Structure formats: structure tokens, C-alpha cells
Amino acid sequence: MASRSLGGLSGSRGGGGGGGGKKSLSARNAAVERRNLITVCRFSVKTLIDRSCFETIDDSSPEFNNFAAVLEQILSHRLKGQVTWFGYESPRSFWDYIRVACRKVSQNCICSIENMENVSSSRAKGRAWIRVALMEKHLSEYISTALRDFKTTRRFYEDGAIVLGEEANMLAGMLLGLNAIDFSFCLKGEGLDGTFPAVIDYTPYLKFEQSSDSISSDEEELRTFGSSDSESSTPENVGPPLILDENTWFNKCKRVRQKYQLTLEQKGYLEELLRLRENQLSESVSQNKILLQRIEDSDLAHKLEKEQLEYIIVELQDQLKSYQSLDQLSAEVSLSQASLDPSHSQEGDGKQDSLNFIGEGKEDTPSLLGLCGSLTSVASYKSLTSLKSNDCLASPTTELTSPGLTPS
């Protein structure tokens, strides 16, 4: 019984150690895989930039095909499958992630790729997106925007994916250099075929380095230890040849010279354009100074005119107040004079009343002249003397001078 228990205990310990070893091995493999993909992506970007100095990059360029394969492998690294109704996971393309995570990019091409007629599968749409983003020079912006949406990235990828690790920031940075390249792609070519996955060609980036402890050269070691059949698969034969013929060097020199001439012409054109723009800028600056001076002068004139108008308004207000005070003073003076001289007003009123009374008396006695007759006759005068005691008759002199008592 004791031996059985010890055996079971040792077996359980051995099983636990084996499980820990498997986890560490899988973690190492995942780290190596991530490091390999990021390194190959850096190499592919560098070779793509170097090739763009000599020719236009299109679908036939092997450097671009290798870069597209590397980027597709990176975006598909540890991508979760799509769960069906029956609980099974179906394979998913990285386009499903890009379509959701890159919606926030301004003026994105997501809808255009979704509406393409000759592209049906998700893998083909993802490859078309890579080409369109490179032609638009926005691939780095798409990747950066997608990586910032950590919630969506976490939903589409498993733990240990490149887009969830520290390598993601390196990926967005190295893709930024591709914005300086002019790409030309045909979105109806064979490169968009989504039937087969992309395969990375590692041979352009492999280089055999001789150890410092080795005595013989690499060629002697390969001839000694390798056969004729195996020599064809050595890195020497697979990679670029070490010695190039004279024609190849001449062609490369010719291309470099043509590139130099083109660059020199572009440099002269840009310098001439720069001088023209500098002249235009100096003219604009001088015109701007003149306009600013005019604006300052007009502002100063407006301020002076405003001050003058305000001064005139103040003067007019003072004059108006003085006139109002004079009118009020004249009214007070007239009232005071009327209150100080009441006899004059009473005499005027009495004269007016007497005149009115005389007129009324004359109108009340219209037959008086007929009874008295003419004032020139003696009889009339005698008859008038007898009536002197009456107050209503005036004196003969008054009657003679009065216009109303003229003889008929």
C-alpha cells in the first residue's frame, strides 16, 4: 500500500512537471514566432524601400508580394475563429477585424472594398485593403487606429498575438516609412485570390556567416561535407550571388545614373519653385505690411472723427441747456413784471371797459342825433347844454371830435 501511494505521488509530480514544461515550451515557441515575424517584416519593408528607388512597385514585384505575405501572417497570428450556431469555430480572416477596428479612420476605404464586385471572400478583401491602403499612403494610420481600439482587438485575438503584445507598437512605426513610396496595383489581378494562404519567402533574408573559429573557408567546407545534390539547396545558391558579372554592374550603374539625373532635375525644379515661392512670400509680406498700415491709419482717423463728434455733441447739449434756462428765465421775468405792476394792467382794463361802454351806449341811443340835430346850429347847442347834467353825454368838444357824432 505504501509503495502504491508513493508511486502515485511520484506519478502526479511527474505529470505536473510535464505540464509546466509544455507551457514554457509553448510560450517560448510563441515568443520566437512573434520575433521572427516582426524581424522579417522589418527586412521586407527595408527591401521594399530599396527597390522603390529603382522601379515602381506593383503586383509583379517580389518584394511587395513577400511584404504582403508577412503582413497577412502578422494580422492573422492567433486570430480567433468565428463560433457557429452549433458551437464550432470556423476559420476567420483578418479582414473581419480590420473592417470593425478601422471604421474610425477618416475617409476610410472600408465601404469601397465591401462593395467591390470581383472580390467576394474575406481573405481577398483583406488583400485588397492592403493594396488600397498602400496606394492611399494610410496603412500605418489604419494599423495604429486598429491597435488603439484595444477592446475590439482583444475580442478578435487570443493571448500571445502580435497585435496584443509590445511588438504592435514596433509594427506601426516600421510601416510609417512606406508612405514615401508610390505604389501601383491592379485590384483585379491574381494577387487577390483568397483560395490559398500567403507564404513567406525567407531566402532573400538568409545569410550564412562563417564562425570565427572555423579554419577553412565556407566554400571548402561545403565542398567537403556537402554533395552535389545538397549544394543546390545551400544558402549560397539560394541567396543572391556574391560575384556579379560586368553587365549587371553596368546596368546597375546606369540605373543609378539615371536616377541621379532625375533627382538632379527634380532638385533644380524644386529650387526654382522655392525661389518663386519666396518672391511671392516677400511680396505678400510687403502687401500685408501696407494693408496693416492702412488699417492703423483708418483706425486713427476713425478715432479722431469719433472724438470730434463726441465734442460737438457735448457742445450742442450745453447750448440746448443754456437755451432752456434762458426760456425759463424770460418766463419768470415776465411773471415777475406782471406781479409787480398791477395798476397798469388795471388801467388798461378800465380803458378797455370804458371804450366798450361808450360803444354800447352809442348803440343803445341811436335816435339821439336825430333829436339834437346838427351840432353847428344854436338850437342844438342849447338843447345840449340842458343835458350836460346827464353823465351819458360827453362835452361839445368831445362830441365834435368824435367820429361817431359827425353832422349829417
From Swiss-Prot:
Residue numbers of Omega-N-methylarginine PTMs: 13
Regions of compositional bias (Gly residues) in chain numbering: 8-22
Gene3D superfamilies the UniProt entry points to: 1.20.58.900
Name of the protein this chain belongs to: RUN domain-containing protein 3B
PROSITE patterns cross-referenced by the UniProt entry: RUN (PS50826)
Top-level taxon of the source organism: Eukaryota
Organism: Mus musculus (Mouse)
Organism ancestry: Eukaryota, Metazoa, Chordata, Craniata, Vertebrata
Oligomer and partners: Interacts with RAP2A.
Keywords, alphabetical: Coiled coil, Methylation, Phosphoprotein
Similarity comment text for this entry: Belongs to the RUNDC3 family.
Signal peptide range: none
InterPro entries linked: Run_dom, Run_dom_sf, RUN_RUNDC3B, RUNDC3A_B
Modified residues (Phosphoserine): 216-217
Keyword Coiled coil assigned: yes
Coiled coil stretches, renumbered: 301-326
Region (Disordered): 1-25, 213-238, 337-359
